[in-house]
Amino acid sequence: MSAGPASSRRPSLLRALVRKSEPPRAFYAPEVFGRAAITNIAQALPPLERVYANIRFSILRPKLLSVMDLLLPDEGRILDIGCGFGLFAAYFGQTQPRRRIVGIDPNARRIEMARKVAGKLGLTEHEFMAADARDAAVRGPFDAAYVLDVMHHIPPEDQLPLLERLRDLLSPRGVLVVKDITTEPAYQVRFTELMDRAMVGWEEPLTYRHHREWGEMLSSLGFKVRMVRVPDVLPYPHVLYVCTKPR
C-alpha cells in the first residue's frame, strides 16, 4: 500500500539516520534509531515475512530492544542464537554498524532470508549459518551473545549444555544477554503460551522456568548475573538476564 507524499519521505530520512557510520553514543536515542531500524527491516522483507516481523517486533518492542542495545558492545563479534530471519541481527547491526553479528538457526530457509535482508541493509559483515546451536561449527571468541525468547523452546536437558557452550565461546568479560519469560503472574504466562502456540503449534514442548531458576543456572556457570524485569504494555512476563563472564 502506498503512503502519502509526506510520509513517503520519512523512511529515507530514517535510513540516513540509522546508517550513519558512527552514531555518537553520548547523544544516542535508542528508541528513535530502533524504530528506524524496524522500518528498514520491514521494507527489506517479502509481504508474508513482513507480517511475521511485525508480530515479533510487537513482542520485543523498541523500548525493550533499546535496553538490550545499550547492554551489547558497540563493536566486535556478537553471536545471535536462534536468529530466524535475522530480524534482531539486522536491528542491532543498524543501531551500531561496527557490530559483526553471526546468526545461527536450524531453519535453512530462514537463514537464506536473513542473508538477503542483511545484504539489502548493507550489513556485509554479518554471517548466518543453518545449524543447531548446540553443535554448530562456530568458532569464538565472541564479545557478546544473545538468546531472545529461544531457551523455553530448547529441551530441558539441553538448556544447560547450550548455555555452557555459549560461555566457552565468549571472550573474558564477554556479555551474554538472555531474554525469556518467568512463570509469574499466571495470567501472563498463559497469555505467552497462547502466543507461542499460535507461532509453533501444539506439538512442540515448551519449558518455562521461574526467573530465580534461570538465575541460578546461569550463576552456576560462573557468570555474574543481573536480572531485569521489563514491564510492557502487553502482558508478557519479560525478564532480561545480563550475564558477564569473568576474566
Question: Which residues does each predicted region cover?
Answer:
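N-terminal, positively charged/glycine-rich alpha-helical extensions of SAM-dependent methyltransferases
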Residues: S2-L48
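A short glycine-rich, Lys/Arg-flanked "PGG" loop and its adjoining helix->strand segment in the class I
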Residues: L160-P172
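Class I SAM-dependent methyltransferase SAM/SAH-binding core
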Residues: L87, Y91-T124, M129-R134
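A conserved beta-strand element that flanks and buttresses the S-adenosyl-L-methionine
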Residues: Y146
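Conserved alpha-helix/loop element of class I SAM-dependent methyltransferases that forms part
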Residues: F57-E75
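Conserved class I S-adenosyl-L-methionine
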Residues: E75-G84
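C-terminal alpha-helical "lid/dimerization" subdomain adjacent to the S-adenosyl-L-methionine
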Residues: K179-L221, M227-V233
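Class I SAM-dependent methyltransferase Rossmann-like catalytic core
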Residues: A42-L60
